[in-house]
């Protein structure tokens, strides 16, 4: 099977449509369909900050749950939105406010539909996907070699948030270790979470979050070709979001 793995979309529907068209997908049915039966996979964070988060929920639900033609690994923003929809006490900030504003603008019956779709999508999706006979792993923030096959709380924190140190940068964002430098596994790890100006290949890992919602690009990785394809963002560029990885 051949896959097109998509980086963090964050509600940037137009960029997602542009990217999938560039990857050869046809939208005549209202959903991206590839003539050669390639499958889409998402590294998570499909919502928040961008203008069309609910549209992305509907599309990914259709592809993953209804048609079973794509793969979705949830990200930290997905986890927070899930907890919001469950009625948990979460802080509506750091991007969640844009999704909540879209949601609250809907009539109540449509709110219920979108909420149930996202809860189903989240609950029926694994923490990460092991694809192509264990040759490639799709996850949100990465995964250590010794964590592959595990799904306990420690692994969940790593996969959703990265290798965090517990310290904070001046802007409040977490300091993360560069786990990819230590990765020695044979399987490719394809992930996002931390915006980079260009797709970042380190050992058998590749970060494809090129900051679409911060004015960078939306990137897809063609697997097994290991070719990256990007489209420019329509949003303003926010330089401080592209911090060097140390």
UniProtKB/Swiss-Prot annotation:
GO terms for cellular component: cytoplasm. Coiled coil: none annotated. SUPFAM superfamilies: Metallo-dependent phosphatases. One of its GO terms (molecular function) is GTP binding. Keywords: GTP-binding, Hydrolase, Nickel, Nucleotide-binding. It catalyses: P(1),P(4)-bis(5'-guanosyl) tetraphosphate + H2O = GMP + GTP + 2 H(+). InterPro entries: Ap4A_hydrolase, Bis(5'-nucleosyl)-tetraP_PrpE, Calcineurin-like_PHP_ApaH, Metallo-depent_PP-like, MPP_PrpE-like. It holds the Pfam family Metallophos. Its cofactor is Ni(2+). Its EC number is 3.6.1.17. Gene3D superfamilies: 3.60.21.10. Asymmetrically hydrolyzes Ap4p to yield AMP and ATP. Belongs to the PrpE family. This is Bis(5'-nucleosyl)-tetraphosphatase PrpE [asymmetrical]. It comes from Bacillus cereus (strain ATCC 14579 / DSM 31 / CCUG 7414 / JCM 2152 / NBRC 15305 / NCIMB 9373 / NCTC 2599 / NRRL B-3711).
